[in-house]
A protein has these predicted regions:
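N-terminal glycine-rich phosphate/adenylate-binding segment common to multiple enzyme folds
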Residues: 78-122
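Extreme N-terminal starter segment of soluble prokaryotic enzymes
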Residues: 1-4
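Short acidic, Gly/Ser-rich segments with clustered Asp/Glu that frequently serve as metal-coordination loops
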Residues: 10-14
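Active-site glycine-rich loop that binds ribose-phosphate moieties when present
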Residues: 83-84, 121-146, 152-155
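Glycine-rich nucleotide/cofactor/substrate-binding loop typically near the N-terminus or early
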Residues: 16, 39-94
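Short, basic, glycine/proline-bearing loop/turn elements
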Residues: 25-29, 70-75, 121-128
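Short catalytic helix/loop segments, enriched in acidic residues and glycine
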Residues: 19-44
C-alpha cells in the first residue's frame, strides 16, 4: 500500500520569515534540512504501518528535500510538471491508497503564520464555497476528488 505525501516548507517547525523559505538565502539551508527531517519522520511512521511513500517536494523549486536522508520506503518527486495537480503532481487513484501533508500552512487571509498565503503571494485570497481556502484545503479536495483519503497533516496551528 502507498502513501502520497505532499511536502511544503512554510509550515515547517520554526520558520517565520520569507528568506528562510527562499533558496539562495542565508537561513534557507537550515529550514530545507528541517523540512527533510519532518518528511523523513513521516516516512518512518508510514513505514511502521507497512506503507511505501512517494514524497512530492511541493515548495518553490521543488528541490528542497535531501533524498539521501529519507528511509528506504520513500522516494521523492522533484521538480514541477505542468498540470492541474501542481503540489499534488504525480497523484493518481490507481497508485495510492492514502494522502498526507507535511509543512503546510494557513490560508492567505489567516494571521496564524507570518508566511500565510495560498499558492502565491500575488493572490489576496482564494475562496472555496464562500470560505478562505488554504493550499491544504485545495489539495485535500483534490485527493477527495480521486477518492483517496487524507490521513495525516502537519504544519502551523492555524490549519
Amino acid at each position: 500500500m502507498k502513501l502520497f505525501l505532499s511536502a511544503d516548507i512554510e509550515g515547517t517547525a520554526g520558520i517565520d520569515t520569507w528568506d528562510e523559505a527562499t533558496p539562495g538565502e542565508r537561513m534557507y539551508p537550515y529550514f530545507a534540512a528541517q523540512m527533510t527531517r519532518e518528511v523523513a519522520a513521516a516516512c518512518r511512521a508510514a513505514g511502521k504501518l507497512g506503507l511505501d511513500v512517494t514524497v512530492k517536494d511541493a515548495h518553490d523549486i521543488a528541490r528542497n528535500i535531501d533524498p539521501s536522508a529519507l528511509p528506504e520506503n520513500a522516494s521523492v518527486l522533484r521538480g514541477w510538471i505542468r498540470d492541474l495537480y501542481c503540489m499534488m503532481g504525480g497523484l493518481d487513484r490507481d497508485s495510492y491508497e492514502y494522502v498526507g501533508f507535511t509543512g503546510y500552512h494557513s490560508d492567505a487571509v489567516s494571521d496564524g503564520n507570518p508566511l500565510s498565503h495560498t499558492m502565491t503571494t500575488g493572490l489576496q485570497r482564494v475562496m472555496l464555497n464562500g470560505k478562505p481556502a488554504s493550499e491544504f484545503v485545495l489539495n485535500a479536495y483534490m485527493a477527495g476528488m480521486l477518492g483517496i483519503p487524507v490521513i495525516f497533516l502537519s504544519g502551523d496551528a492555524a490549519l
